[in-house]
Amino acid sequence: MEATAILRGARISPQKARLVAAQVRGLSAESAVNILRFSSKKAACLIKKVVESAIANAENNHGSNIDALKINTIIVDEGRMLKRFMARAKGRSSRIVKRSSHITVVVGPAK
């Protein structure tokens, strides 16, 4: 059985989070957590929590063996954008877009 975990509204841009997600896509759950644990990127900490939550969901809800789990899919979608203004020279202003992400992780048995 597949188990899912979703983090909505993570305050990181999807472009930055997708770089980390691509590193662990398709790996076993244990090796993915180890890679994310030693990564220095902010997205790695967020994705590690979601992967660990999906592993816990698989164990508690479906009784899956943790050692046999693999990351089937990991998707990073765009979330809500916060629009802010920054003061510039000569009375002007420019727009700042603070992006957020929705991170979805699906783990299942390795085939």
Curated annotation (Swiss-Prot):
Disulfide bonds: none annotated. One of its GO terms (biological process) is translation. GO terms for molecular function: rRNA binding; structural constituent of ribosome. InterPro entries: Ribosomal_uL22 (IPR001063), Ribosomal_uL22_bac/chlpt-type (IPR005727), Ribosomal_uL22_bac/org-type (IPR047867), Ribosomal_uL22_CS (IPR018260), Ribosomal_uL22_sf (IPR036394). PROSITE patterns: RIBOSOMAL_L22. One of its GO terms (cellular component) is cytosolic large ribosomal subunit. Keywords: Ribonucleoprotein, Ribosomal protein, RNA-binding, rRNA-binding. The keyword rRNA processing does not apply. Part of the 50S ribosomal subunit. This protein binds specifically to 23S rRNA; its binding is stimulated by other ribosomal proteins, e.g. L4, L17, and L20. It is important during the early stages of 50S assembly. It makes multiple contacts with different domains of the 23S rRNA in the assembled 50S subunit and ribosome. The globular domain of the protein is located near the polypeptide exit tunnel on the outside of the subunit, while an extended beta-hairpin is found that lines the wall of the exit tunnel in the center of the 70S ribosome. Belongs to the universal ribosomal protein uL22 family. This is Large ribosomal subunit protein uL22. The lineage of its organism: Bacteria, Pseudomonadati, Pseudomonadota, Gammaproteobacteria, Lysobacterales.
